[in-house]
Every structure is written in structure tokens, then in C-alpha cells.
Amino acid sequence: ELDTDVLRDYPSILFGLETAFRHLLTGSWALYDTDFSQGKAGIPINGLIWMGDFDTMLSRIEEKMAAGFRCIKLKIGAIGFEDELALLRHIRAHFSSREIELRVDANGAFSPADAMEKLKRLSELELHSIEQPIRAGQWEEMARLAADSPLPIALDEELIGCNTPEGKRKLLSAINPQYIVLKPSLHGGICGGNEWIAEAEKRHIGWWITSALESNIGLNAIAQWCATFD
């Protein structure tokens, strides 16, 4: 039996061992008994697009939509906020919020001083949410944004290093975000992810699961774990 408590501070190793133990238990790459693992059903996923020029981004979005994606995540904070805002407006001019759900990830690019104004401007574009608007570790500032922002906030990097159940409860109660984003290799493996989900749901905080540059073995485990949830 895997001692998950000993490995709490090493989430990537923990996730790898959880996957290996699951493979050993099932004797198959079908790690869970679900319709998805049996090839009978799919799971909804988003398409990821990095910021670029108008034509390139529009082309990429059209490609994603042609492939069946209706939820697109865009990285922001790299090419200048005004340019990124213009690109998002350009996208919305072509695709309504009914046609495509847009999520953005700032990776902590905003400062506490200007974050609220940027969030207000982004909210005008009918976005679903923004991940990590300011860098991690600024709990008071993040809590203020989560309470007052017109655009729902999702925590990502904020969760890294918060590995105990007590720590998870403390963080979620202090910041009270609208969403959390779970990456098993960074946020406690599968067992740690389940703890995050349980604590989030007690507080009516939404959540979703994603990846962090894993191999196909890791992506397989993440996708199959996702499929265990309704």
C-alpha cells in the first residue's frame, strides 16, 4: 500500500507512484472502470491557445472549433494588456459567448494595484473566468479580488505547496475563490486532488482538472481520473 502522507511534499513523485500502483492493481492501462476507460464515452476538454497576432489566433480558434472544441483557454500577460484586450475583442467580434466559452490564464502577470481595473475590462468580454490574476502568496490581495471582481477567479499556482488537509482548508477559507484548477503533479497527486475537491465543494467553490506538461502516461491517468466524476 502506498504511504501517501510521506509523499505529500513531493506531488509529482506521488502522482507517478499512484499511477504505477493503479496500473499494478488493474493489470491494464484502463485504470478505472468507467465508460471513458472502456472507450464508450468521452470527456469534455478545452483547447489551449497561446497569444499571437490577430490572424494566427483567429486561425487557431477556427481550427479548434472545427475539431469540436467549444471551450478555449488563452494565456495572457505576455504581449501587453492593451494588445491582448484587442485580441480578445477581435475574437468576441467573430464568436459570441454562446458559440465559444473563453477562459484566460494570467499566470500571476497583474499587479495588485492594477488587477481590479484589468479584471473589470476583461469582464466586458463575457469571459468564463481568469486563472491566477496576481502572483501566488498574496492571500489578502487575492481574497479582495475574489470578493469584488466582476470576473470569476480561479486559483492555480496558489495551490502549489499547500499539501496538508489543514493547509487546504486554511487557503480556501481565506481567499474563497470562485474556482480552483487542479494539476495532480503539482497539487498533491490524485489523493491530494480529491482532498482539494472535497474542501472546495464544502464551500461551493467550483473546480476543474488539468495537466502540467505530463507525458502520455500522465495524461492517460489524469483523463481517466476525470472520468470518475459526474
What spans do the regions from the language model cover?
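N-terminal capping/lid subdomain adjacent to the active-site entrance of alpha/beta enzymes
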Residues: E1-L102, N107-A109, M116, K120-S123
